Amino acid sequence: MTPGIRAPFFLLLLLASLKGFLALPSEENSVTSSQDTSSSLASTTTPVHSSNSDPATRPPGDSTSSPVQSSTSSPATRAPEDSTSTAVLSGTSSPATTAPVNSASSPVAHGDTSSPATSLSKDSNSSPVVHSGTSSAATTAPVDSTSSPVVHGGTSSPATSPPGDSTSSPDHSSTSSPATRAPEDSTSTAVLSGTSSPATTAPVDSTSSPVAHDDTSSPATSLSEDSASSPVAHGGTSSPATSPLRDSTSSPVHSSASIQNIKTTSDLASTPDHNGTSVTTTSSALGSATSPDHSGTSTTTNSSESVLATTPVYSSMPFSTTKVTSGSAIIPDHNGSSVLPTSSVLGSATSLVYNTSAIATTPVSNGTQPSVPSQYPVSPTMATTSSHSTIASSSYYSTVPFSTFSSNSSPQLSVGVSFFFLSFYIQNHPFNSSLEDPSSNYYQELKRNISGLFLQIFNGDFLGISSIKFRSGSVVVESTVVFREGTFSASDVKSQLIQHKKEADDYNLTISEVKVNEMQFPPSAQSRPGVPGWGIALLVLVCILVALAIVYFLALAVCQCRRKSYGQLDIFPTQDTYHPMSEYPTYHTHGRYVPPGSTKRSPYEEVSAGNGSSSLSYTNPAVVTTSANL
């Protein structure tokens, strides 16, 4: 007998034996117990539950069991590896279904107030689990398994987390939140229609179908590496959180009133659909596409860190953040009163379609921006480098255009002006001390009338009047009038004032004794061609140095000339010039003059000590006589 045939019979026997002592009392609305249903080792398990409690049923390896239960308990079924398990639960409690490695598990359908937990292991195929109870079940599809979505028709909401290379399509129609996990290379499809919420988890390389919730809770969908996640649809007031990771595609559809967090990472696409009042937060990284659709009053913020455009919108009380990273496209669609701000960086395309109450758009750097509508708070957002933003908005917003610079420039004086000193008398106004105060009403009234008169007479050629002074003598007006250069001369101004005395009467001014003199101003200072100031200073310094050098050389030349014109007087000779004639000092009255450079002694200085044989010798007779007498 094949394992597929043995498994149902084994389950029937086991259920019949356990029916008597595992039955639990039924309750009308809720049952607080939950069992585990596990399918393992290439077996096919199809439990059918229609009772209030769930017994635990475990078929051995390579077996196929199809239990039908109509009592108040529900078993826990485990199908071994390479098995296909299909659990249908219609009691008030929730079994836990686990399909191990390389197994295919069918979904468990719950029509009671509890929700089962389904676990699909590696290379297993898991059919969707249908929940209609009030408990919460967890569906887990392990590595390389295929799990069908879990459908909830109660008040709970499932959380679907398929990891890498998995595709999860959670559909939520209950008020609690189940968690569905499909492991690596597995496909999990959990359908929950009870009041409980299963948890479905699809791990790495697995494909998980979405979990549909029609309740008020919020499921969480997590897609891991290389996984594809189908959208999660919410028909209640809760909001699911979808987090598909690397190389995954998530398309959550939301129609609840809570807060939904959608996070896609690394080449994934997430599409949330909101029909309630919830707030969606979408985060996708590395080439993901996020398309949230909003029909409620929630607020979604999309922020991408690279290669996308940024569009912030604020219109409601809740606030969420959508983050898309590295080459992702975000296309949110709003049909309610919610607001979705989207921020993108570095060259992505973001198309936002808003039917909400407030929109604020601020794209930067090569972006296409229409107007900036703002209502309530407006957040500035920056999109850099090749970003394109297209926004269609409607219903209740005010458009704020970009700031433009419009200035009322004063008359350009660079075209050339002419100044005239004007003096005249006003006969019909008395002079008093208030005309000496420029802030007085009398002063301002006369000044205003005079300016209006000149503007009427000279039209556009009159540029202004300044330095108005009033002095006594009725009222004597002394002022400086400015006209365009070359338009009027002093005589023309005087004649125009005299001819237009009737216009002066309209301003309650009776003018007489007009005197006009043209004011001559020196031409504008221009840089004259010549030596600059620093050049002149340098030239003066050089001249002083040259003069000092000339004086020095003149003094040196004079010294050289004086040295050549006079002889050399040896006052202190280096050699001894005194040579005594004899040993008696009385005969030596003075010295002898020795010319410079002469070393030869005078013949008179030589004394011979002999008998005078030398012709050059000199003998003193007195000395000789004296020595003879002795």
Swiss-Prot record:
Region of interest called Interaction with P53, as start-end residue ranges on this chain: 567-603
Residues recorded with modification Phosphotyrosine: Y578, Y587, Y593, Y604, Y618
Lipidation (S-palmitoyl cysteine): C559, C561
Coiled-coil stretches noted in the UniProt entry, renumbered to this chain: none
Physiological role: The alpha subunit has cell adhesive properties. Can act both as an adhesion and an anti-adhesion protein. May provide a protective layer on epithelial cells against bacterial and enzyme attack. The beta subunit contains a C-terminal domain which is involved in cell signaling, through phosphorylations and protein-protein interactions. Modulates signaling in ERK, Src and NF-kappaB pathways. In activated T-cells, influences directly or indirectly the Ras/MAPK pathway. Regulates P53-mediated transcription and determines cell fate in the genotoxic stress response. Binds, together with KLF4, the PE21 promoter element of P53 and represses P53 activity.
Region (Disordered), start-end ranges: 30-305, 589-615
Phosphoserine modified-residue sites: S602
Positions annotated with a glycan in the UniProt record: 43-46, 50-51, 53, 57, 275, 302, 335, 355, 366, 432, 449, 508
Annotated Low complexity bias: 30-46, 63-75, 152-180, 276-305
Quaternary organization: The alpha subunit forms a tight, non-covalent heterodimeric complex with the proteolytically-released beta-subunit. Binds directly the SH2 domain of GRB2, and forms a MUC1/GRB2/SOS1 complex involved in RAS signaling. The cytoplasmic tail (MUC1CT) interacts with several proteins such as SRC, CTNNB1 and ERBs. Interaction with the SH2 domain of CSK decreases interaction with GSK3B. Interacts with CTNNB1/beta-catenin and JUP/gamma-catenin and promotes cell adhesion. Interaction with JUP/gamma-catenin is induced by heregulin. Binds PRKCD, ERBB2, ERBB3 and ERBB4.
Motif (Required for interaction with AP1S2): 618-621
Stretches the record annotates as 16 X 20 AA approximate tandem repeats: 42-366
Protein name: Mucin-1
Main location: membrane
